[in-house]
C-alpha cells in the first residue's frame, strides 16, 4: 500500500492539469474468499485511498481504479489441460464464465483515462465475478 500511496502522492504533483491517475486493485477488494485476506485488504485500501485522493486533487486531475477478476496471464504457471481446469474452476460461476484477457483489462484502464467525466470510482473488469452465485 505504501508503494501506491507514494506513487500517487509524488506523481500527482507532476500530472498535467486535466490528467489522470489509474490504480489497479482486484475483485477480492470487495469480496474476500478464504485465503485472500492480504489481497483483499490491500485492494480495499487502494480503492479507499483512491476515493479520498479524488476529493483532494479534483478538479485539476482525476484518479480511478480498475479492478480485474480472474485474468489469463503468464502469472499462472500451470500449463495445458490443468490450466484450463483451474480457470474453469475459478470462473464457472461468473456471469461470463471464463478468465479475462489482459487486453480486456487494458480497455478498462483506457476507459477511465480517456473519459473526462469519470473520477473517484472503480471499474470492475471481472466477467461478473462480484455478482456470481456462491
What residue spans do the PLM features occupy?
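Conserved SDR Rossmann-fold cofactor-binding beta-strand/turn motif
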Residues: 62-72, 124-126
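C-terminal substrate-recognition "lid" of short-chain dehydrogenase/reductases
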Residues: 98-125, 130
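Rossmann-like NAD(H)/NADP(H) cofactor-binding core
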Residues: 22, 64, 121
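Conserved loop-to-helix N-cap of the C-terminal "lid" that shapes the substrate pocket in Rossmann-like
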Residues: 65, 84-87, 96-106
